[in-house]
Amino acid sequence: MAPAPPPPPPAPAPAAAAPAPPLMTGDRSALLNSIQKGKKLKKATTNDRSAPVVGGGVVGERKSNTPKSFAAPPVPTGAPSLPTSSNNTQQAEERPSMPALGGLFAGGMPKLRHIGKSSASAAPPSAPAPPTPQSELRPPTSAPPRPSIPPPSPASAPPIPSKAPPIPSSLPPPAQPAAPVKSPPSAPSLPSAVPPMPPKVPPPPLSQAPVANTSSRPSSFAPPAGHAPNVTSESPKFPNRGPSIPSASVPPVPPSSYVLQQRPNRVDDHGRFHFKDDSYLPIPHPFLGVPKVYRGGSGTTVPLNLSSF
């Protein structure tokens, strides 16, 4: 008999039920349904306040009807014209609107001014100043010029004193020319011409002969007696500068003990150079006409014969 067929496989177990979808709120379900249906979302606008504000507005704003406040005024031409508010308004309206720029140029492109011109380029050039006269260019003086002092007239000149002025005390008395010893008439003229000196000033040197003559003269020519002792007691002694006083003869200078002597010219033949006879020289070796053989340092076949030396 044939074997029985195998039993059929058991039936598969029933499939597990799918998990239930989570409960959704009404707002989320509506948004999800709109996304699933393909509805376009509304584009969001972002107000970025981090950009710099230039010209009174935020960067990115367009001002089509308002004039650019950051633009520089036009450069003045040869014919000066005063800028007015109406002219600026007309120029701003006639100027075509430029596309808005971002960053620092949002208010408009600034114009660079030339070097050397003032910042207020719109101001009209001032009229040239009139030339200043030469009289105004001179600086004002603090005081009027003083008139030059006229030279003194001969009548107002002081009279020339007949006597010599007194010698100042700070300087030593100059040497006065003394009269010669053998001329007695010149002695009385000295007291009359020279006034009495102050007590602290030394008297000028006088020769001995005039002093003796003045003592023999009357007392009217002599100086006051009250001043004489003061002059001699307080005046220092100065060396006499006058040639009239005979000075002591200077002793002759004693002869020096050192006397120059002429040395004889002699030749010292035996001092530096010595010239001697040939007999003092050593005896030279006798000359032998025999050829000598010297041994080389690198070796030679010639034997060394010491008897030949």
UniProtKB/Swiss-Prot annotation:
One biological process term in Gene Ontology: endocytosis
Composition-biased stretches (Pro residues): 1-13, 141-207
GO cellular component: actin cortical patch; cytosol; medial cortex; nucleus; old growing cell tip
Subcellular location(s) per record: Cytoplasm, Cytoskeleton
Assembly behavior: Interacts with wsp1. Interacts with myo1 (via SH3 domain). Interacts with actin monomers.
Membership in a protein family: Belongs to the verprolin family.
Full protein name: Verprolin
